[in-house]
Amino acid sequence: MVSERAHMVEFSLLTGLAIGPTVGLFATLAMDLVMARLPEGETPPKVAASVLTGESVDTAPARLATWIHYVAGAGSGLLFVGIAAVLGTALGGSVATLTAASVVQLTLMVGFFAFVPLPRATGVPRGRRARVRRAWAIEATAYVLVAAFVVAAVGRVI
């Protein structure tokens, strides 16, 4: 349940499990809008598909890349809600909680992508990696901003 007390973000475990993937879906749909506008914007999901299949990023299965994108987005929403809940116990569930959760989530998303799948992907030369990392950082920022807004709206933090 969402607590009315002091405008805190407080979710029960069950509510958090239900809300997290929904938050992630909304944030992923917003991310899609950003991805479509960037030169390497649609490359990050293909990076994940490349790692899983061993194929080049440019020939990785599009359907698999899309599936990975949305499943990872839903899972990241669950992670964001969990981080916000944990930080809420320490910071009191205020706007500071969502700010701190956003910083942690963005760091995890960008760091994980830059150090785990991107270096393992096939067909991404060093020069292109920098452009893909930059695109991912912009997309992840959009994701986190929307996730924070949705959690704030649901948790009545705003």
What does each model-found stretch correspond to?
Residues 1-158:
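Juxtamembrane/disordered regions of integral membrane proteins
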